[in-house]
């Protein structure tokens, strides 16, 4: 059965389409108009390479060695040496989904027609993607300008039959992986090595998947907060439209609307309508303001990433219309670095306020429930250490939220004297997302135990659906047990999408 097809043209790629490629569920093809642009740019590079005029990256050295002229007979060796010398990454390989996206994003940049790649080299890249030949790319070694040189060099190694690649998940020498897939390596011609290694695609590969996950976690944070609110018999009034309209931040309005949707048809809110409590703590009452600010930060990051993945970030750039090959700075990752720092800070705020809500749940002076929600407390410790784990994750997330985008270490003998550290921002953002997911899993688990004490009165549509799904997998804690298993089980419901899907079905009929 044929798979759905995704045409790339360098201009219209969407974040959601990237997720399909990460999961290897579509066949990627080059749009005809893009193919024509690629050929025209290559023809111009060939004309320049045949002449005697110096042109960076075509017949010169690289970086600080740009003033060194290269003889025509050595142009192929120049490109090969570039790939070999720049493949200096260290650390664990990018996970397969991120490495697939890296290859896709490089193809999309080449499809714009400003890089001067040969059509047959781009065709090899697309065939690798479609036949599941995924380069082994160490995740550390990029300072984010001139783009992600080391990660992209490891990607390019496979094109020339060097390095390593995964073929259908099996790690192999690149030449063997290509052979198994029925592909042959290429010999790089003038400028092609540079066309493969200059750009921000590694930070964007990690960053786009981080962004999509962060947006999911923002929805999950609203759900966890709503579930805690119901478990604590909190008020729905702070979420009414009138309060949001007089401040009018879009993120705040979106969060409040989502909370109202989740809490609809709550019997619990009616059960304490005449209680003496006047106000809830900030971690409950101010969810629209805090979660909403995080949403706005993520909206900013999305806008930057949507532009970046469809941008020409090579250097030099090939302008066919004016027959010029011009050096510039589009490889500099500062926009992406700043955006991913903001995304990490947004996620850290979601985990920080979640941890405070867990404290509300387990503290009997605040919840009116048994200490740590334990039955026969004293003999049982209940969720005491779950809150400690959440606090530890928040503390580490705060350290990781120090912005990478304000750091810069000059390189290349001072020629590259300001860099973005965009890959650093992406990698630490990915870690923060992991921690945020775990914090929210803990809150959902603890909130479910609180709702046990409120049964049979039903919570709002969203929390009730989440509660019922969690309880179908994880029983009420009657006595102490290994909590890490329960946290992992809730995390699995989150990662699979099952939890949010169940909630959306209950609240929207989707």
UniProtKB/Swiss-Prot annotation:
The modification 2,3-didehydroalanine (Ser) is found at residue 146. Pathway: Amino-acid degradation; L-histidine degradation into L-glutamate; N-formimidoyl-L-glutamate from L-histidine: step 1/3. Keywords: Cytoplasm, Histidine metabolism, Lyase. The keyword Lyase applies. One of its GO terms (molecular function) is histidine ammonia-lyase activity. It catalyses: L-histidine = trans-urocanate + NH4(+). HAMAP family: His_ammonia_lyase. Belongs to the PAL/histidase family. This is Histidine ammonia-lyase. The lineage of its organism: Bacteria, Pseudomonadati, Myxococcota, Myxococcia, Myxococcales. The gene is hutH.
């Amino acid at each position: 059965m044929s798979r759905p097809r995704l045409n790339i043209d360098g201009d219209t790629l969407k974040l959601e389409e990237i997720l399909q490629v990460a999961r290897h569920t579509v066949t990627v093809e080059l749009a005809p108009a893009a193919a024509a642009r690629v050929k025209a740019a290559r023809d111009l590079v060939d004309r320049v390479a045949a002449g005697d005029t110096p042109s960076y990256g075509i017949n010169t050295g690289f970086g600080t060695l740009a003033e060194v002229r290269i003889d025509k007979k050595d142009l192929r060796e120049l490109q090969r040496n570039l790939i070999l010398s720049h493949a200096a990454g260290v650390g664990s390989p990018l996970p397969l989904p991120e490495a697939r996206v890296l290859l896709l994003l490089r193809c999309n940049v080449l499809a714009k027609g400003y890089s001067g790649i040969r059509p047959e080299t781009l065709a090899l890249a697309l065939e690798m993607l479609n036949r599941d030949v995924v380069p082994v790319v160490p995740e550390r070694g990029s300072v984010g300008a001139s783009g992600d040189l080391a990660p992209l060099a490891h990607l390019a190694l496979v094109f020339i039959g060097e390095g390593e690649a995964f073929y259908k998940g099996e790690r192999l020498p690149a030449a063997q992986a290509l052979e198994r897939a029925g592909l042959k390596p290429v010999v790089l011609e003038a400028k092609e090595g540079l066309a493969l290694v200059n750009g921000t695609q590694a930070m964007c590969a990690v960053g786009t998947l981080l962004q999509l996950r962060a947006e999911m976690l923002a929805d999950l944070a609203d759900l966890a907060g709503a579930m805690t609110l119901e478990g604590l018999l909190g008020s729905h009034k702070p979420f009414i439209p009138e309060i949001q309209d007089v401040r009018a931040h879009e993120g705040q309005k979106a969060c409040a609307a989502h909370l109202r949707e989740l809490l609809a048809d709550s019997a619990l809110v009616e059960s304490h309508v005449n209680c003496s409590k006047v106000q809830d703590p900030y971690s409950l009452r101010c969810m629209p303001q805090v979660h909403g600010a995080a949403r706005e930060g993520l909206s900013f990051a999305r806008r930057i990433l949507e532009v970046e993945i469809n941008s020409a970030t090579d250097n030099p750039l090939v302008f066919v219309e004016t027959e010029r090959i011009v050096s510039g700075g589009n490889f500099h990752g500062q926009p992406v670095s700043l955006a991913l720092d903001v995304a990490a800070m947004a996620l850290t705020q979601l985990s920080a306020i979640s941890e405070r809500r867990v404290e509300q749940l387990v503290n009997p002076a605040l919840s009116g429930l048994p200490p740590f929600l334990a039955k026969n407390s004293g003999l049982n410790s209940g969720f005491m250490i779950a809150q400690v784990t959440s606090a530890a994750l928040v503390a580490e997330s705060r350290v990781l939220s120090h912005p990478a985008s304000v750091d810069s270490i000059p390189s290349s003998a001072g020629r590259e004297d300001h860099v973005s550290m965009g890959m650093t921002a992406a990698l630490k953002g990915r870690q923060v997302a992991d921690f945020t997911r775990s914090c929210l899993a803990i809150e959902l688990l603890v909130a479910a135990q609180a709702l046990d004490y409120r049964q049979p009165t039903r919570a709002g549509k969203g929390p009730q659906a989440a509660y019922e799904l969690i309880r179908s997998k994880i029983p009420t804690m009657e006595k102490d047990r290994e909590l890490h298993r329960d946290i992992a089980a809730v995390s699995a419901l989150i990662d699979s999408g099952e939890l949010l899907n169940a909630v959306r079905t209950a609240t929207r009929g989707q």
